[in-house]
Swiss-Prot record:
GO annotation, cellular component aspect: kinetochore; nucleus
Region described as Interaction with AME1: spans on this chain: 234-264
Function: Component of the kinetochore, a multiprotein complex that assembles on centromeric DNA and attaches chromosomes to spindle microtubules, mediating chromosome segregation and sister chromatid segregation during meiosis and mitosis. Component of the inner kinetochore COMA subcomplex, which connects centromere-associated proteins and the outer kinetochore. COMA interacts with other inner kinetochore proteins to form the inner kinetochore constitutive centromere-associated network (CCAN), which serves as a structural platform for outer kinetochore assembly.
Region (Interaction with NKP1-NKP2): 350-383
GO biological process, any: meiotic cell cycle
Listed name of the protein: Inner kinetochore subunit OKP1
Residue ranges of the region described as CTF19-MCM21 binding motif: 318-337
Compartment(s) of residence: Nucleus; Chromosome, Centromere, Kinetochore
Subunit structure: Component of the heterotetrameric kinetochore subcomplex COMA, which consists of AME1, CTF19, MCM21 and OKP1. The COMA subcomplex is part of a larger constitutive centromere-associated network (CCAN) (also known as central kinetochore CTF19 complex in yeast). COMA binds the centromeric nucleosome-binding protein MIF2, and to the outer kinetochore MIND subcomplex. OKP1 interacts directly with AME1, with an NKP1-NKP2 dimer, and with CTF19-MCM21.
Intrachain S-S bonds: none
The family this protein is said to belong to: Belongs to the CENP-Q/OKP1 family.
Biased composition (Basic and acidic residues): 77-87
Amino acid sequence: MSKRYLDDVLSPDTGTSDSDSSIENLNADNYRIDIVNDNARRDDIDRIQSSNLNHEPPYNLEGVFAIDDDEHGDEMVRKDSDRRQDITEDNDDSFVPDITTPPRERKRVRFGINEKGGDEEFNNVSPWDFKRLIRKFYKEQLPDTYQIRNWKRPSKDMLTNFIDLIENNIELASEEVFKQYHQELNQLYPDSEEQAKLKDSLENKVFDTTYNIKKRLKRTKVPSKIWVDNLNMEYIYAKGESIKKRYKSELDRAEAIERQLIREEEHLKSLQEKGETQAKKRKQVLSKELSELSKTMHPSLSVALSNTFGLIKDDKMSNEIYQQDKIDFNLKLKTDFSKPLISEKEENSLNGLTNAMDNNRELVNEIFGKISALLQPKKNSNE
């Protein structure tokens, strides 16, 4: 059977079928990728440029490789056969044009594309939307030259400290409120237990709100890095002028303080000089008065008087009289005043003797009083 099929294929009298004639009449150049007609090329370029304007991929692959589903398999076979012929055939007259790629759209740098309008975003902010509230407050308080670059979650220590400050004041605040409205509470809730329950319920509600605040604060972000725009010439000039003015004011203030210190030093020196001159004058006046008094007074009194006025120093206090008496009367002091003169036993014995003498004196006084009392009535009876 296989031999019969080979004979039919190799025989020259076999007729061509309709399918073979249709394939021969087709122009393979119309289905080649490397040879493109001018009109089709313009249509493809216009289609690609319009797609680029709508921010789609730079190449419209579906437009370039648009093939019907029914003819997809046959055309792929023809294209493969055409490529093989181009590779095998060496024809100098055949011209294959270069593949032209459509021009790409240049990348454009767009700043703040993901940022919303500042005023419109923060016009109506919910009080529980902490994320937007924090951004709004930072935007209002920071100057225009400051820009926040990075945002991060708040730390646990920051959150715990903030919540502790609120929770520690809840009980104190509730007590102050109940004290302030004590009369109204007594009218509405005369029972103390009901007031206590009301207080507990209010405190629990406040604690619940603080818990919700903590949960929402965990989701917020705070700025971690700020960039200062120092390239604004007006800002740099204004900042330089303010620094100059402040530096000048500080210099003037320092000079004023120095001048004040110099004046105070001069005043102190003048006071010291006045004090020294007054002391010298006072000493001269006192010495003159003492010299006049010493003429009419005893020499020992004049020395004592001069000592009372402080004109004689302690080093110059003389004991000439004592030394003279010591020589005249042969005085010798053997006692050591650094040690106690009497021992404890002697002191105790002396104390006992003094007590006994005091007791004896009291007895003598009592006896004398009794005797005098007995003698007085006898005198009256004799009379």
